[in-house]
């Protein structure tokens, strides 16, 4: 399989968002490096398929990736048990490591970027038909509400970064978008209802 560092396009860096559950930290797989600030960066490259699988392992349905991995941090090498799960647990949009002027002491894959592309696999605006009365449905809607609020905060941050010229722009495609409300729909848009 293809390794992350083997994914190369001119001036393009790949970052796949995940969450390390033991330390409750962001875990980033990337073409530059992989790891989390608590453990450091992995000493070995990772398969793209493994990074994608870890990033998409929704905790309610799929198991986390549980491995002993070797890291390097501040020149020291150590092995840590690492439990990696869905990126949305810690940073649902995966943009926190892309914010300008991040400190690499507290985040991996820190890079200066001027344009951010983040994809959202959400359902769009709730239609109000849900009746979360019993415990399981209340818990699901609670998580959905937390994610929606986190998205709103991140959307606001991206708009402020653009308005202050800290980034040139951003693109936020998402599955739940209202295609009829797009200000400039592309001519080859595949509509949500198709």
Locate the predicted segments by residue.
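Active-site gating loop/helix substructures
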Residues: 2-101
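Non-catalytic peripheral regions of patatin-like phospholipases
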Residues: 31-39, 43-44, 74-194
């Amino acid at each position: 399989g293809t390794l992350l560092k083997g994914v190369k396009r001119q001036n393009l860096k790949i970052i796949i968002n995940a969450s390390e559950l033991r330390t409750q930290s962001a875990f980033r797989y990337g073409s530059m490096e992989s790891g989390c600030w608590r453990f450091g960066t992995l000493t070995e490259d990772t398969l793209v398929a493994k990074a994608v699988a870890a990033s998409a392992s929704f905790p309610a349905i799929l198991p986390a990736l549980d491995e002993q991995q070797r890291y390097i941090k501040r020149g020291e090498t150590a092995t840590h048990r690492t439990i990696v799960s869905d990126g949305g647990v810690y940073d649902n949009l995966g943009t926190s490591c892309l914010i300008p002027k991040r400190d690499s002491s507290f985040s991996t894959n820190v890079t200066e970027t001027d344009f951010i592309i983040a994809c959202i696999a959400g359902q769009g605006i709730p239609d109000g038909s849900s009746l979360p009365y019993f415990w399981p449905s209340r818990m699901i809607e609670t998580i959905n509400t937390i994610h929606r609020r986190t998205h709103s905060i991140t959307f606001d941050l991206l708009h402020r970064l653009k308005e202050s010229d800290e980034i040139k722009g951003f693109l936020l495609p998402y599955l739940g978008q209202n295609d009829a409300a797009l200000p400039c729909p592309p001519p080859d848009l595949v509509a949500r209802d198709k």
